[in-house]
Amino acid sequence: MMYEKRSYTGYGHPSSHYDYPPPSGPPGSFYLADVPPQHFYQWRSPPGIVRILQGSVVILCLVIFACVASTLAWEYYGSGGLLGYGGGLGSYYNGYYGGYNGYYYGGLTNPRAANGFMIAMAVLCFLVTLGLVIAGLSKASGARSRRFYLLVAVLSGLLAFVMLIASIVYVVGVNPRAGLGASSGSLYYNQMLMLCNQMMSPVAGGIMNQYLYHYCMVDPQEAVAIVCGFLTVILLCVICYFAQKTRHKIWKYGKPNIFWDKPLATAEGPNVEEWVKNVSGDVGTQDETATLAYSEKPISPLTSAFLPAQENGYGHSTPSSPSVPPPEGPSPPEEKDKGSVSRPPARRGHRQRPRPTGLEESQYETDYTTAAESSGEQNRDDWASLYPPIISDAIRQTYKAEFNNDLQRYKALCAEMDDIGTQLRQLSHELDCLPEGSLRYQGVAEEYNRLKDLKRSPEYQSKKLETQSLRDKLCHIKRMVGGYDQSRS
């Protein structure tokens, strides 16, 4: 057989190749404190910081280009005007001009070459960084891999190196005092130093003074270009750091635990920590509306017809005792789910069906506890006989300890069934995107049907009813503790 079935964990495609061991749970799971989800769509995340810094580098490159280009007129036209005007000043200044001309094209830094090199490197940095920004903002899978951010780090390091060289060359080219220091004591140095010292003298006329001022002093736009050049070097080095940090997070947490796009907002149940805090408090008014189940999912309109109406926040349904045997058959929603989803892999082809809403999807995939299936009137009476109202602090501590133990068991069951529901949703999405008849499609469909069979198994149904029973028990104990605390206050 051409298709080799791989072990599937539900967090990626069964035929995908992992560069790292897959994590042990779905992204954003409440129970995986050691594997927190990474929200890479946020601007304060490492890839978000990389994009911000790259945008800053693009702006700095534009500023460098504008500032350097604004001084080119002095280099290409000011020199000719100065030498032509100085020809009539006599042999004294002609000697200096000859020395200046020898310096200008001699072994020292040529300001024209420095300007051209700075502009060329700024344009190169602008184009490369802009290309990386556009690629990083795209939703292509290649732009969300460790290999891409390795490319970002390498290119940013190379750009930082060439921009550092260009900035140093530009500083030496536009600041003759920095360049002349290397030739201290030479004839060229003495001649140019004398010209720069007489920069403010009105003897040579206005044209010579203006050009000498430009040559001997650093213009404001040249200073801005120098500062922007070194800032660009620093930002490129920081980009290298955050690109490597992004690669490390992808390797450490795994691609399934990374959100590149903002997840759709879905209705969530109450916070378990707040619930436990309210119960654990010594004094406080307990709100019975806060006794909803931790993993309770909203009811979709399609399945509400199977469920009785609710009254005072508790649904009337078949009561569950502390120990409930496994049911002989699936519940009505399960029967509907069974008839419509579990089918041969070949018949679940690529179809453009509308994606279910968060409410409807969660109802079908994690329907082990719903408000309409638990906390019936008779069930509350059963728990009231087992856990009567609290009359002393000792009984309250006993209730509280039992509440904490049952809560841990309840959370573990919810996590286990949430995991199955998450895998089914991911597999359903993959089946909608794959072409029917492909080997990859067959493998995903087999895993999908296996999980659906698991949901209909007696073991799963037993856990489902145990979760419902634990929820009713926790709600009752919470009311007893809340009533006792309220009576004392």
UniProtKB/Swiss-Prot annotation:
Region feature (Disordered): 308-382
Membrane topology category: Multi-pass membrane protein
Domain MARVEL, residue spans: 45-248
Pro residues bias spans: 322-332
Key words of the record: Cell junction, Cell membrane, Coiled coil, Disulfide bond, Membrane, Phosphoprotein, Tight junction, Transmembrane, Transmembrane helix
One cellular component term from this protein's GO annotations in UniProt: plasma membrane
Molecular function GO terms recorded: cis-regulatory region sequence-specific DNA binding
Record's compositionally biased regions (Polar residues): 365-377
Spans through the membrane: 52-74, 113-137, 148-172, 223-244
The OCEL domain, residue ranges: 381-489
Modified residues annotated as Phosphothreonine in this record: T285, T369, T370
Cytoplasmic side of membrane: 1-51, 138-147, 245-489
Ranges of compositional bias, category Basic residues: 345-354
PTM-bearing positions, type Phosphotyrosine: Y364, Y368
Domain of life of the organism encoding this protein: Eukaryota
Coiled coil: 407-434
The keyword Repeat appears for this protein: no
Domain topic, free-text comment: The C-terminal is cytoplasmic and is important for interaction with ZO-1. Necessary for the tight junction localization. Involved in the regulation of the permeability barrier function of the tight junction.
Function according to Swiss-Prot or TrEMBL: May play a role in the formation and regulation of the tight junction (TJ) paracellular permeability barrier.
Family: Belongs to the ELL/occludin family.
Name of this chain's protein: Occludin
Organism field: Potorous tridactylus
Organism classification: Eukaryota, Metazoa, Chordata, Craniata, Vertebrata
